[in-house]
A protein has these predicted regions:
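Active-site-proximal alpha/beta segments of enzymes that process anionic O-linked groups
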Residues: 7-137, 145-152, 239-273
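Glycine-rich, phosphate-binding/catalytic loops in enzymes
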Residues: 16-21, 158-161, 209-213
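A long, amphipathic alpha-helix that forms part
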Residues: 118-140, 147-204, 543
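Phosphate/adenylate-binding glycine loop and adjacent helical scaffold
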Residues: 265, 269-375, 397, 401-410, ...
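Alpha-helical transmembrane segments of integral membrane proteins
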Residues: 356-918
Length: 918
């Protein structure tokens, strides 16, 4: 019986009081108890593989977890079938996909539809009564998902956990009682194994390497297990999850899976006669030694292998002495225990070394990918510095060689090394062949650099000049981005990356506050010499939106605007002469305070994630009313901001209706309170679908109105033309508003409040503070990227897979649809980065589209945004992939480096999609 996400403390800790029958068995000495540690990644499919094969799955199984295929590797389930055992299975359908045609009877349940935690377990339990009276099966496997789904929805502290554990305890009692009755009439006793596949983080998710995610209980029950010592919860034997496969194989008289790395638990073999126990350990050690010989070249001189040889010799000597027991005075059990200890040391030593070195990597593919990323980085740098890149002329010969090396050779090499006619010369693994193969790829990046720097010999000089002319704030944005990238070379900085972004964001906020405070003070004490906030020195390189302007043109525009109280590019849009400079000081100070509150909203990272935070306090059952009021106020705040930015009455009403729908969706889930409604919580699918319907209606309305305005536009109709420009300039802001409420629908209830604060900060930044700072478009892009990354961590995300909110993928769904689920999860996870990027485009569009030459300037600004975004992704990817490839055998490769690489890859995919849409 496997209970998904069953943490060790749910059985052995304080929560064990909710499983009274199980605890009574533990304390009466009627069970064998272990703590089984799982290797990361702690997601279901890799854990099932580990339980069945005794091996350590790779991190690619995190992706394959959503689409499991047949397991080809030797495993315990296949050995059961080959031995003629009849197996029945009920529960997570991942087992059915991994082991097709293995089960005599099955009833699979979908493991990914996390909003259901009742029906999914009932569909398993309904078969138990009938199966316990059947005698046509030998092995029954039950996989319960309800506890895992509750964790994803509400966390381990939810009031739903207690009744679920009581429900599981009642099932354990039913099965154990029935098996004890059957054993009274059977020759061989039954074995009941209770375990978990992984644990559950304090946020309710899993996938990472924290103790709460990796530590699970293993309890063995049988009519033959009696009179054990009273359990000491502080001294429970610890094993690895991969040890379960060889342990069960030996207890059931089956061959151990060929590639198992597990070592049978001595505690599980404790009840066997000493001769049988030593024989079982010999079989396990022999199997491990076979794997060891295949994977450790110097095994003959290795201490672990020599220990195995000594254990074999001691075992042989023990058997000889046992045969001469009548002639020689010996204590068979005492000597046998010494032999068992030698076997155990040999097994644990070989297991540890194999586990740390067994991973195999395609070095050629790794190097190829790294070099291609560096090519992209160099190319983007070149394009960013040389803004006339669109008219750059490259010789035909250079272009042909570049294409051949970039596409032709890698394709040919891939086909050669993966096809049936594999070439040992190109694809071998010895030093000479690897050198010949990888040397070609090194030539590839050298050629790329040669083409780039020979086509523009002044590139470095131009880039240096462009840096020297930037403002201190722009330099800080550039140096901070580069500094953050190199900070990723430290595992501690990766684990606590949120601290870097919090520091950067608050530094920007303080710079803005100091800037406006200085201007306000200057205006107060020198009213006659007040400097306009948008003006800069004449030698400034370029202002926000001034990309590519010559000094003469910039001076001309300043002269034209010298008599105006508005910025030269916003004159006519609003009345600026009456603006109080202290207004910007107040807004800047509010941003600083709000971001400090957000810093404490969700503790994340590794070292301090366990500390209590505002979110933990709000999700407590006794704080439901407080959360309800805060969610309502937050939704009202978002609606007010949207009403300020939109004049269209239909939009205003639709967005207000969507906000109400979001609240009722959370009320249906039981997260917030609505008086007289939703006495029994449900998944809120209908409420969420109503919100989706409103969004669809808004999109259709916008599209039809856009078509109508464009069709009725006449060249001589200046009024229509002006309206069309205004309408076009507001399109990104409309998308931004829809995206805002989609995010509010998907995030956890307490994060609705956090995201409302992010919306408030974005409104102040975009509409009031930054437009008056004359930042270049590239600097604006970096600033918005910084705020987006900080918001990513404000949501409670981290570089651990455990913080991914799986439940967001099922909002409004009645059935399992992997495409929609993946899209919703991506939106919820990367809500803040996407939100800020769309906000950036909204600001640029509103600024340029209404101007006389606005279309050309908007296109130029869009190119700047795309190049800067590309660089902001290519730089960390190029650096970090080198680190990940070099440290692929590091202790933290699975717990730190690999999850971060997955996050970087997914963030890059979303950024590329955004660039393509632009």
């Amino acid at each position: 019986m496997l209970i998904d996400a069953l943490r060790a403390d749910f059985v052995f800790g304080d929560a064990g009081r909710w499983m009274p029958y199980t605890r009574r068995l533990l304390e009466n000495g009627q069970s064998l108890n272990f703590i089984a540690k799982a290797h990361p990644p702690t997601v279901t499919m890799p854990r099932i593989k580990a339980l069945a094969t005794g091996g350590i799955p790779g991190f690619v199984d995190v992706v394959l977890n959503f689409d499991s295929s047949e397991l080809q590797e030797d495993n315990l389930i296949t050995q059961l079938r080959h031995s003629g055992r009849k197996i029945i299975f009920y529960g997570d359908d991942t087992w059915i996909r991994l082991f097709p045609d293995h089960f005599q009877r099955t009833d699979g349940t979908t493991s990914f539809f996390v909003t259901d935690y009742t029906e999914v377990d009932y569909n398993v339990s309904r078969h138990i009564d009938s199966e316990l009276v059947n005698n046509d099966w030998d092995v029954m496997i039950l996989h319960y998902l309800g506890l895992d789904h509750i964790g994803h929805l509400a966390g381990p502290g939810s009031p739903l956990v207690q009744p679920k554990l009581k429900e599981m305890d009642a099932i354990i009692q039913k099965i154990h009682t029935a098996l004890n009755k059957q054993d009274a009439y059977q020759e061989q006793p039954s074995l009941f194994v209770l375990c978990g596949d992984h644990g559950m983080s304090d946020q309710g998710s899993h996938g990472g390497a924290s103790i709460s995610e990796t530590v699970t209980p293993l309890v063995m029950l049988s009519s033959q297990i009696k009179g054990q010592k009273r359990i000491d919860y502080e001294k429970i034997e610890e094993i690895y999850q991969i040890d379960i496969a060889p342990t069960l194989s030996l207890l059931l008289g089956l061959p151990i899976p060929q590639n198992s790395l597990g070592a049978a638990s001595p505690g599980a073999l404790h009840g066997l006669p000493i001769r049988m126990k030593l024989h079982a350990m010999q079989i396990n050690t022999h199997q491990l030694a076979k794997v060891y010989r295949q994977n450790v070249p110097s095994y003959k001189s290795d201490d672990n292998y020599l220990m195995y040889k000594r254990a074999l010799g001691a075992h042989s000597e023990w058997l000889r002495l046992l045969a001469d027991e009548g002639k020689v005075e010996i204590d068979p059990k005492h000597l046998g225990d010494k032999v068992a200890n030698q076997y155990l040391r040999a097994m644990t030593g070989m297991r540890g070394k194999l586990a740390s070195s067994l991973s195999k990597y395609d070095v050629q593919a790794l190097v190829t990918g790294v070099l291609l990323l560096w090519m992209v980085l160099l190319s983007l740098l070149h394009c960013h510095v040389n803004r006339d890149i669109m008219s750059l002329e490259v010789s035909t010969g250079s272009l042909a060689v570049f294409i051949a090396f970039s596409f032709g050779f890698p394709t040919a090499h891939f086909v050669t090394c993966t096809g049936p006619n594999r070439s040992d010369l190109l694809c071998g693994i010895d030093l000479l062949r690897v050198f010949l193969s990888l040397g070609t790829y090194v030539a590839l990046i050298i050629l790329t650099g040669f083409i780039i720097f020979t086509t523009s010999r002044k590139t470095i000089v131009q880039y240096y000049k462009s840096l020297s002319s930037k403002t201190p704030l722009e330099l800080f944005l550039i140096l901070g981005t580069v500094g953050h990238t190199f900070s990723l070379l430290s595992s501690s900085f990766v684990e606590e990356e949120h601290q870097t972004w919090y520091f950067f964001m608050q530094t920007i906020n303080l710079i803005i506050l100091i800037k406006y405070s200085a201007e306000a003070a200057h205006a107060y004490y020198n009213p006659s010499r007040r400097k306009k906030p948008w003006e800069k020195a004449e030698d400034s390189s370029k202002g926000f939106g001034g990309s590519g302007l010559s000094n003469r043109e910039r001076r001309r525009r300043l002269r034209q605007s010298s008599s105006s109280e508005c910025p030269p590019e916003t004159s006519g849009e609003s009345s600026c002469e009456s603006v109080n400079p202290w207004k910007f000081v107040v807004l800047s100070f509010i941003c600083v305070c709000v971001c400090r509150i957000l810093r404490s909203w969700n503790q994340t990272g590794d070292k301090w994630a366990h500390l209590p935070d505002v979110g933990d306090w709000l999700v407590r059952p006794e704080q439901k009313m407080v959360l309800s009021y805060l969610v309502a106020v937050s939704l009202m705040l978002v609606v007010i901001i949207q009403w300020i930015t939109h004049q269209d009455q239909f939009y205003r009403v639709a967005l207000a209706g969507a906000a109400i729908g979001v609240y009722f969706f959370r009320a249906a889930n039981g997260a917030v309170h609505v008086s007289g409604m939703y006495e029994n919580s449900n998944n809120g699918a209908k409420e969420a679908q109503a919100v989706y319907g409103l969004f669809a209606l808004v999109i259709i309305y916008t599209f039809l109105w856009y078509i109508y305005v464009k069709m009725t536009l006449h060249q001589d109709n200046t009024e229509h033309g002006a309206y069309f420009k205004t309408f076009s300039s507001t399109l990104p802001r409309r998308v931004h508003s829809i995206l805002t409420l989609v995010i509010m629908l998907l995030v956890r209830p307490h994060n609705i409040v956090a995201f409302a604060m992010i919306v408030l900060v974005e409104y102040f930044i975009s509409m009031h503070l930054v437009p008056r700072m004359n930042l270049s478009v590239s600097a604006m892009t970096l600033l918005y990227v910084w705020f987006g990354q900080a918001g990513f961590y404000f949501q409670g995300n981290s570089n651990s897979l455990a913080t991914v909110d799986v439940s967001a993928g099922y909002v409004g769904l009645d059935s399992y649809n992997p495409g929609i689920i993946g899209m919703l999860m991506a939106i919820a996870t990367y809500a803040s980065p996407v939100f800020w990027l769309v906000g950036l485009i909204s600001v640029l569009c509103e600024k340029y589209v209404g101007m006389q030459d606005g279309e050309e300037r908007y296109i130029a600004a869009t190119y700047d945004v795309c190049f800067t975004l590309g660089l902001s992704r290519a730089l960390p990817l190029a650096i970090y992939t080198v680190l990940a490839a070099a440290l692929r055998y590091h202790l933290f490769v699975w717990s730190v480096f690999s999850p971060k690489l997955l996050y970087e890859g997914m963030c890059s995919v979303i950024t590329i999609i955004f660039i393509v849409l632009l």
